[in-house]
Design a protein with these regions (language model features):
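Catalytic machinery of carbohydrate-active enzymes
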Residues: 1-335
């Protein structure tokens, strides 16, 4: 059976769809293609369970110099290509389907459409949400495989394969010593409630370096905080480095998602706020200390790895001290 999975959300949601992709492909009865957006596509790039990966550019994800018309023409070509594929089934991989996904269904016109949410004439298999509440997003998305009677009854590990050439280049550029553990501090977060301040990251780095022979890799979203399209944390990274002049910290300015994935693949543990980077670490099998502000750990905790969630009662990560996070690090990552 030819199956198209449409997952057009962010990095974390896309990675949390990979157990469903794996279960369908590894059943031996289905060819699985995936449609996503250019922003999330790199996390699926080398996935062996995907026959064909299609992606389009959202208008607000256009690169500098990429015109709106060119973007729309590219999307039209993709629509025509998908229509020719003659899929048997389309799965809308979202906890509740939306109109954006349905637009692609109208183009593809499969025999069956599987989705979660409210009824629609185009949706042939409308599934109820999993009965367990609260439910992890990976379990919610995996429930979309119920009509296929898969042998797996629960989602397995996430799948993410780094680009080996990029990883090798970063290993050389950053002078990574393979005999010494590398721990990643990922300092960026989209939500203000999940943005742990620079001084606390510096304090954490001091504590880790004082107690463990290690290399510390500092990772962040590139760009200035004032960039209106893609705000980054260049200033925060510089502040942390200035506070830790004598520590074994390697500031790795990853300018693309494949670079971030490759950099994390060189590490043996991760401290990060909830978000796409946290799920990348989990998908690579790293033990994770996850800082949660105003989001629900029951739905979004790192999947199928050793992890510890820290969420203060205020739901503001800056209520956490560097000592609290270090204790979680020592318990979760170095033991």
């Amino acid at each position: 059976m030819r199956v198209l999975i449409i997952c057009r959300d962010n990095i974390g949601d896309t990675l949390l769809t990979t157990p469903l992709i794996s279960a369908l492909a590894q059943s031996g009865q289905h060819q699985v293609d995936v449609l996503t957006n250019n922003y999330a596509a790199p996390v699926l790039q080398h996935n062996p369970d995907i026959r064909q990966l299609f992606y389009y550019t959202k208008l607000h994800h256009r690169e500098a110099g990429q015109g709106r018309l060119a973007c729309l023409l590219q999307r039209l070509k993709l629509m025509l290509m998908l229509k020719k594929q003659r899929y048997d089934v389309v799965i809308l991989a979202k906890s509740r389907w939306d109109q954006h996904g349905l637009k692609w269904v109208k183009t593809v016109r499969p025999a069956r459409v599987i989705a979660l949410g409210h009824p629609h004439p185009l949706i042939t298999d409308l599934l109820p949400p999993p009965s367990q509440s609260p439910c992890h997003i990976s379990e919610t998305l995996f429930s979309l495989g119920r009509p296929f009677n898969l042998s797996a009854t629960a989602p397995g590990k996430l799948t993410l394969l780094p680009d080996a050439a990029i990883a090798a280049s970063l290993r050389d550029t950053c002078a990574i010593d393979p005999a010494v553990p590398v721990y990643a501090l990922q300092i960026s977060a989209r939500k203000p409630s999940q943005q742990w301040e620079a001084a606390r990251f510096a304090g954490l780095a001091e504590k880790i370096a004082a107690r463990h022979p290690c290399q510390i890799m500092l990772l962040w979203s590139p760009g200035s905080r004032d960039n209106p399209r893609h705000p980054g944390d260049d200033e925060k990274a510089r502040e942390i480095m200035a506070l830790c002049p004598h520590l074994p910290i390697k500031a790795v300015a990853t300018t693309s998602l494949p670079q971030l994935i490759a950099a994390m693949s060189l590490c043996q543990g991760l401290v990060s706020s909830d978000g796409g980077a946290m799920h990348i670490g989990a998908a690579l099998g790293l033990p994770v200390v996850a800082l949660f502000g105003d989001s629900d750990p029951a739905c979004w905790h790192p999947w199928q790895v050793n992890y510890q969630v820290l969420q203060p009662a205020s739901r503001e990560v800056n209520a956490l001290s560097s000592s609290e996070v270090y204790d979680a690090f020592a318990h979760t990552i170095t033991q």
